[in-house]
Amino acid sequence: MTELKNDRFLRALMRQPVDRTPVWMMRQAGRYLPEYRATRAKAGDFLSLCKNTPLACEVTLQPLERYPLDAAILFSDILTIPDALGLGLYFETGEGPKFRKVIRSEADVDALPRMNAESDLDYVMNAVSTIRRELNGRVPLIGFSGSPWTLATYMIEGGSSKTFSEAKKLMYGQPEVMHRLLDHLADSVIDYLNGQIKAGAQAVQIFDTWGGVLSSWAYEEFSLRYMTKIVDGLIRESEGRRVPVIVFTKNGGQWLESIADCGADAVGLDWTTDIGNARARVGDKVALQGNMDPAMLYAPKARIRQEVADILKRYGSGSGHVFNLGHGITPDVDPEHAGAFIEAVVELSGQYHQ
C-alpha cells in the first residue's frame, strides 16, 4: 500500500505529537453537499449508492476535494449487517430506514444466520479497497460499524424509534434472549470490522447511536459489554502500524470512565459533555474525539470560529484530540459553513501543539 502522506489523525488517536489538531466530520460525505446529491441521483437511491463501488468511492472522496480534512470515512450505513442477516433493509422517503422482518422472539434470534462479512458484505469490502487505492496515501481511511445494541434496536423496532419500547420489552422481559442477540451481533461486527481492516481501513469507529437511551446498569450490561468484546476481537495491527479503535456513544458522557476502560484508543464525545472536563476525567488513558454541536454550523461563520476556539482552549495543549462534530452533520447545513468550521480548526489549533 502507498505510504501515508498525512498521518495526523492516526497520531492524535495514539496521543503522539502532531503539528495541529486533526479534523473530520461524521457524515462528511452527505446530503449537505450538492455534488453528493448529484451522485446519489445517479445511483437512484441511498442503498444503491452504498452498493455501487465506484459511486460509493466517489462520494467518500468528495468532501476531501472541498476541504482540508485529515481522514476519509467509508461511505456506507450502519444497517448493512442486519440487511446481510436477511432482515430486508429498505428506506422510505422522509421516514428513514425500515426492515421487512423484525426480531421479537427467541425463535427469531435462533433463526438468524451466521454472517460471513467478506462474502455477504463484499460490496463494502470492495468499496474499502477501492477508496484506499484512490486515496493514494492522502489521508487515512476510517471503517465503521454500528454497535450491537444500536443494531438490535433497529432490528427489533423495525426502524428508528422514539421510545424503544419493543427493544426494552425484550431486554427487560427476556434478558437472556437479548444477550443471545447481542452476542450474535458482536461476532458479526468483529467479522465485519476485521474484513474492513483487511481490505485497507486504517482506523475503525463503533457507532453506539442509541446507547444513551439506557439506564446506567443497562448500558454497562447490554451495550458497553458487547463493544468491549468487539474491541478485544479486532485486528489491532495492519501494514506495520496500529489500527486505532474509536467508540462513540451518543449521550454517553456520564459513562466516560467506563467507556475509556473498554480497550479502545479513543472515545467519541457528543456536544453535551465539556471536553476539558472529559480530558480531566480520562487523563491520558484515551484520546478524545469531538465535540462541537452540529447545529452550530447554522450560526454565522464568526460564531462557528469562536466555538472552535473555545473547544480547542477547553481541551488545552498537547495531542490526543481529534476535532469533530458531536454527531453527524445535518443535510441543510451550508457547505461554506462546514468549510468555516474546518478552516478554523486548521488555522487555530497549531498553537496548542508547540
Swiss-Prot record:
The keyword Transcription does not apply. PROSITE patterns: UROD_1, UROD_2. Substrate binds at R27, Q28, A29, G30, R31, D77, Y154, T209, H327. It holds the Pfam family URO-D. Its EC number is 4.1.1.37. It is found in: Cytoplasm. It is an enzyme of class 4 (lyase). Pathway: Porphyrin-containing compound metabolism; protoporphyrin-IX biosynthesis; coproporphyrinogen-III from 5-aminolevulinate: step 4/4. Its main location: cytoplasm. GO terms for molecular function: uroporphyrinogen decarboxylase activity. One of its GO terms (cellular component) is cytosol. InterPro entries: UROD/MetE-like_sf (IPR038071), Uroporphyrinogen_deCO2ase_HemE (IPR006361), Uroporphyrinogen_deCOase (IPR000257). Keywords: Cytoplasm, Decarboxylase, Lyase, Porphyrin biosynthesis. The record marks D77 as: Transition state stabilizer. GO terms for biological process: protoporphyrinogen IX biosynthetic process from glutamate. The keyword Transcription does not apply. It comes from the Bacteria. NCBIfam families: hemE. Catalyzes the decarboxylation of four acetate groups of uroporphyrinogen-III to yield coproporphyrinogen-III. Homodimer. PANTHER family: METHYLTETRAHYDROFOLATE:HOMOCYSTEINE METHYLTRANSFERASE RELATED, UROPORPHYRINOGEN DECARBOXYLASE. This is Uroporphyrinogen decarboxylase.
